Amino acid sequence: MAKDPLAEAGLHFDELNKLRVLEPDVSQKTTELKEECEEFVDKIGQFQKIVGGLIELVDELAKEAETEKMKAIGARNLLKSVEKQREAQHQQLQALIAEKKMQLERYRIEYEALQKVEAEQSEFIDQFILQK
């Protein structure tokens, strides 16, 4: 089989009979590769858009989570504060109860002493009246 002198020189005709430097199958594969690359670039662009949207969503969720976390910390601190206030109030009331108990005991002792004095005075009055 005789070789084409143009093919030996590296020149080829395509399906439209245009003169090409590349072999037709190499040219076809190059075109296919170019199309695949364009598709790949388009898909990468779509992927980047999707990932960008996901990143924004995750950022928003992170902000919301941080806000809720701060609210929870604030509520916990408020609860601790209320608990401390109640404990302080409880201690104050316990001290007041102890003070009132002591006062009640003093009043009871004073009452008993006054009853004793009253009994003695009544006895003295009775003896004084009987002596007359």
UniProtKB/Swiss-Prot annotation:
GO terms for biological process: cell differentiation; cilium assembly; intraciliary transport; protein localization to cilium; regulation of platelet-derived growth factor receptor-alpha signaling pathway; spermatogenesis. GO terms for cellular component: acrosomal vesicle; axoneme; centriole; centrosome; ciliary basal body; ciliary base; cytoplasm; Golgi apparatus. InterPro entries: FT20 (IPR028172). Pfam families: IFT20. It is found in: Golgi apparatus, cis-Golgi network; Cytoplasm, Cytoskeleton, Microtubule organizing center, Centrosome, Centriole; Cell projection, Cilium; Golgi apparatus. It comes from the Eukaryota. Its main location: Golgi. Keywords: Cell projection, Cilium biogenesis/degradation, Coiled coil, Cytoplasm, Cytoplasmic vesicle, Cytoskeleton, Differentiation, Golgi apparatus, Spermatogenesis. Residues 74-123 form a coiled coil. Involved in ciliary process assembly. May play a role in the trafficking of ciliary membrane proteins from the Golgi complex to the cilium. Regulates the platelet-derived growth factor receptor-alpha (PDGFRA) signaling pathway. Plays an important role in spermatogenesis, particularly spermiogenesis, when germ cells form flagella. This is Intraflagellar transport protein 20 homolog. The gene is ift20.
